[in-house]
A protein has these predicted regions:
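A glycine-rich helix N-cap at a beta->alpha junction
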Residues: 110-118, 204-227
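Generic N-terminal amphipathic, Lys/Arg-enriched alpha-helix
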Residues: 24-31, 44-60
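Glycine/small-residue-rich phosphate/adenosyl-binding loop
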Residues: 11, 15-18, 88-170
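Small-aliphatic-rich amphipathic alpha-helix that forms the alpha element of a beta-alpha
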Residues: 52, 71-76, 145, 151-202
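C-terminal helix-cap and adjacent tail motif
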Residues: 8-37, 41, 213-243
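Glycine-rich, charged/polar anion/phosphate-binding loops
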Residues: 74-76, 128-133, 199-201, 224
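Glycine-rich phosphate/pyrophosphate-binding beta-alpha loops
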Residues: 76-83
Length: 243
């Protein structure tokens, strides 16, 4: 409400928001660049991210905890349904817990690979990338981060709060986390052992949280190799309707 009556919605401009009734709003402080600056920043970022690869061999060099925390804080800037931020990042550096996670993951993956729980076509697709049921990087990486999806929120009185688009929101946060790590020179891998319920048990997570993805994090070991891969060209991933 304004001093003279109900608020009026005006056409959206650079500093206006279409519907502000009932909310708490502050001025947007984003920076606008010139077109040449935009092109330069975009190309530099594309070149940086084009070098990103999944790494399974990590150096023994320690990684300062604050670097991983900064990447988590960056991931926490992700958009989410109704701004409910339905994610929990669990940071693991304890060698004993990392070993427990590795053993539990390998037990599940051994069953997947060796006892027909994994479809043959999927096994063929990932085997050519050099994967197996053995996951030594879950111990050798200095840090593990397990990202949990909060399927619903829990209020202070124990009641449930519905979360909207939780899976999509957590997926976006995961992508930003990967980019943040790569930007600072750290490597990671998206690992999704199936099933993943053991992560909830080992990390003592509540029932409203579900494991989403596991990230081993560290510096690539010297001499690390990665599969020779080709990313899709722009005309394979872009459909345009003009503009």
């Amino acid at each position: 409400m304004s001093a003279t009556g109900p608020a009026v919605c005006h056409p959206v401009g650079m500093t206006e928001y279409p519907y502000t009734d009932g909310g708490d709003f502050v001025p947007y402080e984003g920076r606008r660049f010139t077109v040449p600056e935009m092109r330069s920043r975009a190309e530099e970022y594309l070149e940086l991210m084009s070098q990103r690869r999944s790494i399974r061999t990590f150096a023994d060099d320690p990684v300062p905890r604050e670097l991983v925390e900064t990447a988590i804080r960056t991931a926490g800037t992700a958009p989410s349904g109704a701004h409910q931020q339905p994610w929990t990042f669990v940071l693991v550096g304890d060698p004993a817990i990392k070993k427990q996670i590795r053993l539990a993951a390998e037990e599940e993956e051994r069953t997947n690979y060796l006892h027909a729980r994994m479809p043959d076509d999927w096994k063929e697709e990932i085997t050519r990338l050099g994967t197996s049921w053995q996951k030594p990087y879950l111990e050798s990486a200095p840090w593990l981060v397990v990202l949990f999806e909060q399927r619903y929120g829990v209020e202070s009185d124990g009641s449930r709060r519905k979360h909207y688009y939780a899976k999509e929101s957590v997926g976006i946060a995961a992508g930003i986390f990967i980019a943040a790590l790569h930007n600072m020179g750290l490597a990671t891998l998206t690992h999704t052992p199936s099933p993943m319920a053991f992560l909830s048990r080992l990390l003592d997570r509540p029932g409203n949280e579900r494991p989403f993805v596991l990230f081993p994090i560290g510096f690539p070991r010297e001499g690390s190799v990665v599969p020779r891969l080709k990313r899709k060209a722009i005309d394979e991933i872009l459909i345009e309707f003009g503009g």
